[in-house]
Structures are given as C-alpha cells and as structure tokens.
C-alpha cells in the first residue's frame, strides 16, 4: 500500500514536470513530420513513416526515463521531504520501488500517448498497421523498464547531472552489445604474434566482461524487422517471453543493487 502511494505521488509529480511535455511535443512533431520525409523516398513512404514513428517513440520514451528519473530521489533529498517519508512506516525498499513504479507508469502513459498518435496517423495515411508494430512497441516498453531501473540506480547514489550522464552512457552502449561481443570474439581469436595476441586477448576479455554487465538492449530492438513485416505476421512470437523475462530480471537486479546502495546512505 505504501509503495502504491509513493508510486502515485511520483507519477503526479512527474506529469507536472515541464520537460515531459516538451519531449512529448517533440515526439508528436517528429511522428507528424515523418510523412513529409517519406515523400522523398519513392515507394518507401509508409516504411519511412513507420521507422521514424517507432524511433521517435523509443528515443523520447528513453529521454523521459533518463531526464525525469535521474532527478526523482535527489529532489526528495534536496527538498528534505525524504525525511518525512522515511520517518513514517515506510521502508527504504518501498520508497525505491514506489519511485520506480511511478516513473514506469509515467513512461507507459507517455508511450501510450505517442503510440496512439503514431498508429492513428499511420491509419489515416493509409499505411498498414501491422501486428509487428505492436510487438516493437511492447519490447520498447520492456526496454524502458530496464532504462528506468538504471536511472533509479544512479539517482539513488549520485546527483541528477551525473546520473543522467551515466544512464545515457548505459543506454547508448546497451544498444551496441552485439557489436561489443562480436569484437571481443574477433580480438580473442584472430590476432597474429604472441605479444599482440596477448594484448588482444586481454582487451577482448575486458570487452566481454563489459558485455556481461551491460543490459543487452539490442535484444529489444526489432524496429527494422517490424517496418518490413507483412500485415498479420508475427516476427518474434517465440522470443517475446524470454526477452521479456530477461528485461524484467535485469531491472529487478538493478533495483536490488540500488537498494543495497540506498540503504547505506545516511539521511
């Protein structure tokens, strides 16, 4: 119950943040402008619209998670309202979980609004609204749950500016996990010369460790496949459950780490 109250208050606080409306407005403008860009590509206008629409929803939802989420806990500390919250029968894990669910709800509402605008615009333009688009949107939301957890983690341990920087770095390199593991494999097996091979193996091993720590956000990116899918075609039906479970598990692990750090802070 306490977690629910904190989540609801967090959502109310987030929707009053002006940056949320700025990001949503830019997202809608990019979606509406996608058709004009699509006219430049002969015969590819619907695909361009779908690609830009999905990318806009992904990008601006990520920005909401990062720029709103990284300041949530710091604001409570700065305004000293955290003392009131934690002096009541509220555990620190309930506070963190409430903040997470509140931000996740904010991200969901943002995504639903942008998705309705995107799909309605596609339909009114005569473009096919395929099942694959809904698959891509669902996995984008699961990705945002991971990014939100990372934002809460850094917010529990650092200032908003540093939290935003670190979360953005994770968000960026999380998209490159496939490239990182491929590079690590190449470095560990295809370099000639003893000294060079040793250095390559060390760098490759280091990259592989980075790969294991980073969230594999590449798993959630099926936007290109969704754009080129036929109406009625499921493109990742067999992978939806394991990818979803991976995202939820990673988010849970990050929140646990955030709790371990936050529980040791003195207020």
Where are these regions (language model features)?
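Secretory targeting signals
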Residues: 31-75, 96-164, 182, 198
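Short cytosolic juxtamembrane segments of multi-pass membrane proteins
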Residues: 263-267
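Alpha-helical transmembrane segments of integral membrane proteins, especially early/N-terminal helices
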Residues: 16-30, 103-105
């Amino acid at each position: 119950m306490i977690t629910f109250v904190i989540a609801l208050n967090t959502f109310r606080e987030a929707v009053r943040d002006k940056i949320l409306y700025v990001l949503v407005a830019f997202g809608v403008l990019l979606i509406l402008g996608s058709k004009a860009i699509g006219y430049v590509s002969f015969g590819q206008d619907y695909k361009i619209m779908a690609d830009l629409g999905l990318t806009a929803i992904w990008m601006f939802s990520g920005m909401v998670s990062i720029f709103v989420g990284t300041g949530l806990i710091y604001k409570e500390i700065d305004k000293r309202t955290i003392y009131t919250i934690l002096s009541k029968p509220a555990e620190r894990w309930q506070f963190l979980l409430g903040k997470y669910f509140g931000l996740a709800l904010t991200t969901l509402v943002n995504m639903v609004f942008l998705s309705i605008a995107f799909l309605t615009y596609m339909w009114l333009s005569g473009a096919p609204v395929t099942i694959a688009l809904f698959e891509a949107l669902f996995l984008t939301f699961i990705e945002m749950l991971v990014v939100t957890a990372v934002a809460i983690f850094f917010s529990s341990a650092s200032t908003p500016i540093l939290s935003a920087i670190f979360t953005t770095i994770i968000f960026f390199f999380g998209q490159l996990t496939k490239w990182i593991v491929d590079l690590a494999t190449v470095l560990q097996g295809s370099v000639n010369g003893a000294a060079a091979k040793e250095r390559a193996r060390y760098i490759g091993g280091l990259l592989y460790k980075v790969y294991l720590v980073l969230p594999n956000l590449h798993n959630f990116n099926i936007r290109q496949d969704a754009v080129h899918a036929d109406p009625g075609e499921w493109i990742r039906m067999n992978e939806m459950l394991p990818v979803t479970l991976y995202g939820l598990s990673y988010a849970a692990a990050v929140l646990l780490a955030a709790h371990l750090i936050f529980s040791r802070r003195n207020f």
